[in-house]
Regions:
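Low-complexity, Ser/Thr/Pro/Gly-rich disordered linker/stalk regions
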Residues: 2, 9-22, 35-279
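Twin-arginine (Tat) signal peptide motif
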Residues: 1-9, 27-30
């Protein structure tokens, strides 16, 4: 972000390299489908490698895996509680058409951050490179919309902060449903894929981000369905930093302004969440 734009945002808010190193084995087993990510050449001994920093289990850690939990924070639908919970080896995010966020033109059921202990969590700061891998199950009831439906975000913590990167379900004027990754700060589309073939099945996600200001950042986004690579796109020279730090969010965050009639009661499942730092 430019110095002038950062100053404006700072006042308003109060205040990847596409690496080729392969994922390290962490020994974790899950009942839900495991990650099946693209093979990559082994790095030379002198190069940086991905270091496992976070490997929660839904079964044993539950919602304690995350820094914060935003379950109906406006208390709009007490009868629907809990909207976010662990079930077996998965984390489930349930959303109903009657749910409302604190801004009543939208809905939100999300978790944030990577908790590593009762009072500790990982902080993604400027100059660092991080990688998140997981599997997600998108049911056919979780449809793309003509306005925003985000199922992953990268944000600066704090009230009112704008998203930096979003993974979204978007419906175009012709009704086509896609899943996309976008650099929200500068509204740059990194990549997209058809959503219909990914409905009602597990999809593997591999997201990498170098946290950098102005043009110092980068991202890489990979989706796999079984053994098929659905999308593998990178963007360098990207602005991936606002201030303080970057924190990931998962769940369902969507606008009520959809004009396609696609909003209905639905859910999202996540499993096999892993966090790595390039070091």
């Amino acid at each position: 972000m430019s110095t002038s734009r950062r100053a404006v945002l700072g006042a308003a808010l109060g205040g990847a390299v596409a690496a080729t190193a392969g994922l390290p084995a962490d020994g974790a087993q899950a009942a839900s489908p495991g990650l099946n990510l693209p093979a990559a050449a082994a790095p030379a001994a002198s190069t940086a490698a991905w270091r496992l920093k976070w490997s929660p289990s839904a079964r044993t850690d539950g919602l304690g895996a995350f820094e914060t939990v935003e379950d109906d924070r406006a208390h709009s639908h007490p009868a629907g509680h809990p909207h976010i919970f662990a079930t077996g080896d998965d984390w489930r995010f349930t959303i109903h058409t009657v749910d409302r966020d604190t801004s009543t033109d939208r809905q939100r059921q999300e978790v944030t951050g990577l908790r590593t202990g009762a009072d500790s969590y990982l902080k993604w700061t400027e100059g660092q490179t991080w990688r998140i891998t997981y599997s997600m199950y998108i049911p056919s009831t979780l449809k793309a919309t003509t306005t925003f439906t985000h199922i992953m975000q990268m944000k600066q913590p704090g009230a009112g902060s704008s998203p930096i990167v979003v993974q979204s379900l978007r419906r175009d004027g012709g009704g086509k449903q896609t899943i996309e990754l976008r650099l929200a700060t500068d509204d740059i589309l990194v990549g997209s894929a058809d959503l219909d073939p990914l409905h009602d099945r597990w999809t593997d996600v591999d997201f990498q981000i170098k946290v950098g200001n102005g043009s110092a950042g980068s991202v890489r986004w990979i989706l796999k369905s079984g053994s098929t690579t659905v999308v593998d796109r990178s963007r360098s020279g990207a602005d991936t930093f606002l201030a303080d730090r970057v924190r990931p969010k998962w769940g369902i965050y969507r606008s009520l302004g959809d004009t396609s009639g696609s909003l209905q009661d639905t859910y999202l499942l996540l499993t096999n969440l892993r966090g790595y730092q390039l070091a």
